[in-house]
Amino acid sequence: VRKFAGTEIAQNLIHEILFYCEVDFKFFTQAVEALGDSIPDCGMKAMIFDAYDKLKAKQLTGQAPDFELPNVKGQKIRLADFRGKHVLLDFWASWCAPCRKKNKELNLQYPELRDAGLEVISVSLDSKKTLWLQALKEDRVEWIQLIDETGFEQSKVREAYKVEQVPTVYLIGPDGNILLKNPEIEEIHEIVKQERA
């Protein structure tokens, strides 16, 4: 996109990958910035910027909304209890195949993340506790697991975090502010390392 900034070619490239852009807002932002201000006015330009503005309005920024949900033992856990630490907040569900895959990937990264001082908290949007517990048993996850049994559609926590699909992950700073949405593992390590330096 940068190579063809200011041309209709760049617009066509973004149009072709618009679906991916809507999944990854950070990438969408970089692509729109790469277009520059010198894009010829046309219907496609308007469509791209309209899609960008709508997606931008859905982004969560500032303080992470606090919540309290039960863990596997039924104990209520509050997000605010982890203030002072980096938190990787993961929204998922047992019926979500990409979420289950992410669990397996995170299993490999978790020891290193934990040793770096980062807490991982997963919030299941399952409406049936038994399915959630079975998935945890199968995936053998070791980090903090919470459930919102109201389910995906009714979850107030999901709404507060503007989660439209799972998996959705937020990196939250020690001050409780949202740092990144759907970060890559490398980005997480880099931010934690920078802030601890």
Residue ranges and their predicted role:
Residues 141, 150-193:
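Thiol/disulfide oxidoreductase modules built on the thioredoxin-like
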Residues 84-86, 116-118, 140-143, 174:
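Loop/turn elements at helix/coil->beta-strand transitions in domains of secreted/extracellular proteins
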Residues 83-84, 91-108:
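Conserved redox-active cysteine motifs that mediate thiol-disulfide chemistry
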Residues 86-87, 167:
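Alpha/beta-hydrolase fold active-site loops
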Residues 1-77:
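Oxidative protein folding and maturation machinery
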Residues 101-139, 150-159:
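Structural microenvironment flanking redox-active thiols in thiol-disulfide oxidoreductases
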Residues 89, 121-123, 146, 170:
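Conserved hydrophobic packing residues within short motifs/helices of P-loop NTPase cores
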